[in-house]
Amino acid sequence: MQLEDMVAAIEASGQYRILRRLNTDCSQLRPRDLFIEPGLIGTKLGGLLDCETTGTDPRTSEIIELAIVPFSYDGDGNILAIHQPYHRLREPSHPIPEAITQLTGIDDAMVAGQVIDLDELEAFIRPIELCTAHKASFDRKFAEGLSPAFASIAWACSVTQVPWREEGFESRALGYLSLKSGFYFDGHRATDDGVATVEILGRRLPRSGRTALSFLLEAAAQVTARVRAPNTPYERKDLLKARGYRWSDGSDGSPKAWWIDVPENRLNEELAFLKAEIYHRECNIPIRMITARDRFSVRAD
């Protein structure tokens, strides 16, 4: 009995689920049965960016590994093909913390003398229409710190802009999403994480039947308003929390205030809520309109 026949027999029993290892060797990648056949009309180029860094603060930490996995897609959110990725290591100005080495497997010896050629990088990303990351609020800030060319690209986030919970997923972690999608991979290396994320975006979600990418494209196209509520009465914080506001303590350089992002068509409703339920008066409330060109960047903070 062939291996695939054995797998089919085990799965048919209804007692087991099989996890397949995802091939992340992009030199062997081609349009797979998972995706529809590539076409030319309406095809766009996206890029899945992932970086490994020396820490979590883009003001003090540095990129040590950068990967961008390009993929072709259509306007309906179907992924047509995955293309050869960009991948580079980079030596930081300080030794890599041991905790980062344990997490990623990247040590000082691996990155010694390694640099990222910005001309090469910027030429690679020039055709990309939408840059996606699994937690874009992290990756975009690091990417723009490396090259200002990333600021001119529209960005999307596969963590926050896909309705994972509504589709039956209990976590948005990449490892969990891959296991629920029926495969596993070697995580915490930039290219592997990138290929795995593209794989997940191309699959149809269990409840809606739509691809994850279709939700991502829809969310990225929206104009949203970031509404800030500074100097609110302490006793009304629970009202803000219940409505979905988050607290910024200013430690990341953003204003110290409660804030929420709402669709443009809900802005007036949100302002009315703040004036009636929080401030109990007419007031000027700070608002910033945000598109995919600025979303997840320091400019949106």
Features from the language model and the residues they span:
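Conserved non-catalytic scaffold segment of RNase H-like nuclease domains
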Residues: Q2-I153, S171-G187, E277, R281-N284, ...
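Conserved beta-strand -> loop -> alpha-helix junction used to position metal-binding or nucleic-acid-contacting
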Residues: A151-W164
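Short linear loop/turn motifs
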Residues: Q114-D119, R189-A196, G250-D261
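Acidic two-metal-ion nuclease catalytic site recognized across multiple nuclease folds
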Residues: M1-E37, R203-D301
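Acidic, Mg2+-coordinating catalytic module of metal-dependent nucleases/exonucleases
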Residues: I128-L146, W164-N231
